[in-house]
Amino acid sequence: MATDYQDITIAFAGICQAATLVQQFANKGVADRAVFSSTIKSLLVTQPQSTLAVYDGNIAHLTMGLATVQAQMGGGNGKLDTEIGRYWINILALSQKLNKDPVAKSQLIQRLKQIERQLSLYDNDIMADQIIANLAAIYSEIISPLGSKIQVLGLQDYLVRPDIQHKVRASLLAGVRAGILWQQVGGSRWQFLFSRKKIFNQAKLFYKDFELSSD
């Protein structure tokens, strides 16, 4: 079966977007609310009709991730952000471990179903502080124990704040979800060695399509 680099790039952009959000929350204490919202919403899309449907069928919801993909795959004028690189590599590793652990996968599905039920208590606002805290708890209790803990670097003033910790962990959870998607559509670590240009070019094409549609 031919490798579908469109789907692989969409899923990888989801991973990179989560990694970028982690970096922004840890260093600035804030991130784009719309980007964070669309990233978190992807956690509750369990039966998508397409890969892009995980992000509400709109490539605009992945522009931050697509920009990061281009930088990570060779479009950053030689200035590779190794911190973001470390995040997405670790997110991928956790998603691969999750995929091989049926007990953890079952627990994750059940906990996300609980989140869906809880939404009605918060006017269906997935950005409600308690919902983000609950998603963070899922990451801490189910995902984090699967592998080495991801060391998040940033400003101590932000890193010690519970609300920032929750947003970071919720972002990591969404990244792991994108990592599962990446595996489902044929993503492979070998592609980062032998197909970097294909991934870069596809991300660039998606980004141009977004720019043209927003003009």
From Swiss-Prot:
<keyword id="KW-1003">Cell membrane</keyword>
<keyword id="KW-0997">Cell inner membrane</keyword>
<dbReference type="Pfam" id="PF04356">
    <property type="entry name" value="DUF489"/>
</dbReference>
<keyword id="KW-0963">Cytoplasm</keyword>
<dbReference type="InterPro" id="IPR035932">
    <property type="entry name" value="HflD-like_sf"/>
</dbReference>
<keyword id="KW-0472">Membrane</keyword>
<dbReference type="InterPro" id="IPR007451">
    <property type="entry name" value="HflD"/>
</dbReference>
<comment type="similarity">
    <text>Belongs to the HflD family.</text>
</comment>
<dbReference type="GO" id="GO:0005737">
    <property type="term" value="C:cytoplasm"/>
</dbReference>
<protein>
    <recommendedName>
        <fullName>High frequency lysogenization protein HflD homolog</fullName>
    </recommendedName>
</protein>
<dbReference type="GO" id="GO:0005886">
    <property type="term" value="C:plasma membrane"/>
</dbReference>
